[in-house]
Amino acid sequence: MKYWYIGAAALVFAVAARVLLCRKKTSPNPEIDGGVRHFHDANAPKEINATEITDFRYKFSTVDLMREDSPIAGHLFTLYACQKEGCFELRDRSKEEGKKTFAPDETFFGKLQQIVSQYAFAQHNGQHYRVSGLPPHFGMELEIRYASGEEIRASNNQSCFLPLEAMEALVALFEQKQ
């Protein structure tokens, strides 16, 4: 019993080795609830010279707004338009209220570009902000492609960065097509 501490040290070493070797491997960037990832593309242009939109996608939520604040409050929207087809989807938090498709006419994309220019959507180009653990119906995603190859891409799953007036103008434009 003179050298009991050697046996105890060996036992502790064996247990520690087992714990270290058998633990789960984690990714280098685990997504912890509340963790924030902010990506800014410094090369994304803040001014777009093109005016011919070929593809427009915008998903956004107004569930955080009071119904008294705006007629579009309390809903989830998906607005999509390309040269051949368009789609307007309106959902409440829990159910789909309506999805309508349409064929955009020649004036539709001109009006859409006016809204994009008026509210300077390009200033948000390249901004991507994500908070892990939030429900999927928060925030917004914006993607606009032009015939010239230029693009506007931005997202934020915590809040909408476009002004309420811009969202209302887009909804009104897409609702006209129904």
List each model region and its residues.
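Feature marks short, highly hydrophobic, charge-poor N-terminal signal-anchor/signal peptide-like helices
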Residues: M1-G7
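Juxtamembrane cytosolic interface motif at the C-terminal end of transmembrane helices
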Residues: Y3, A17-K24
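Core hydrophobic alpha-helical transmembrane segments of single-pass membrane proteins
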Residues: G7-A17
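Short, well-ordered, aromatic-rich surface patches in folded extracellular/luminal domains
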Residues: C22-S70, K100-T107, K111-V116, A120-Q178
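Broad, structure-driven detector of short, well-ordered beta-strand segments within folded domains
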Residues: M66-C82
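Residues that act as N-cap/strand-start positions at coil-to-secondary-structure junctions
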Residues: A73-H75, E96, P136
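Short, solvent-exposed coil/turn segments at beta-strand boundaries
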Residues: L79-C87, S148
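Acidic/histidine-rich, surface-exposed loop or edge segments in extracytoplasmic proteins
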Residues: G86-K99
